[in-house]
Curated annotation (Swiss-Prot):
Belongs to the cyclin family. Cyclin C subfamily. Essential for progression through the cell cycle. Possesses kinase activity that can be detected when myelin basic protein (MBP) is provided as an exogenous substrate. This is Cyclin mcs2. It is found in: Nucleus. NCBIfam families: ccl1. The keyword Cell cycle applies. It comes from Schizosaccharomyces pombe (strain 972 / ATCC 24843).
Amino acid sequence: MSADKFRDSTHYRDWIFTEEDLSKTRAKVNEKFTNIVRERMLEELSLQNKEASLEVLPPTLTVEEELELVNYYSFQLNALSSALSLPTHIRSTAILFFKRFYLINSVMEYSPKIISFTSLFLATKCNDHYISIEQFCKNMPKTTPEEVLEYEFNVCQSLKWDLYVWLPFRPLQGFLLDCQTVLPKVAVEKFYECHDLSKKFLIETLHSDIYFLHSPSIIALGAIYHTNPTICLQYIEAKKIPELQPLIISISANLKATKKFKIEKKKAQDYGRKLYFCMNPLRNKSSALYLKRKAEEESTNNNKWAKKFSTSSNVLDKNPFE
């Protein structure tokens, strides 16, 4: 993959950050939706004729708790994709769709469980891997086609309609093919083994923030270094790019730490219970606020149709030939 080509992509422009910018982005999203959710909860309490004050509201999720839930559902999404025997590029695309969505939105606004399913179904369509929505939902516990499709537009919009994801698997293959040329003394079997282990390692670390910080090519080299440091260092020396060595070693260490990191199910369940009480009531179709907004929307639409019909009737009442 050409570095110049990647730097011209929307992936690089919109989805590569510094660590500081990534943290700030998540903090801003959390603050924004915390305020929105609190306002909606106050409206809901008022409609129920209950005390509506900030003191009685349940606590909202912190930035860290939101990130823990996003990472937990990233794990679940990876496991689900594996159970469905979906190709590597589809599961990778789905996880990155999912994580990108929550750089723009909050789990307090959109259910991470539903968005994970929506992201996966969208990834199958973007990669020409046809599955009917009915067949797809047969594999999803207690999920309907309507739920999966309801937020598909929101996901696409949040992704800025950038539905092509640059992944490290193609650069991985390219580097190891190049290695066979520049390192002729190394047995070919070593490269095959390195490829398979590196690919497996990358799949196991798809939930890492590394994908928001570095290009797929550098991530691929980090995976090669993790799997076979000797081959990676010899390749760097042969290509005369020693300045990349510290970065590659750092990425490899980061990915290794990510692989070991797993969220305890109990902790995720605790955050899930907290989330249940601080979800935006406007997303709950049985809430007083949702029913009120729906009635207002229907009334507005009915008035528009009535006005349009009235105008049409007046036109038809006139004889165009007089």
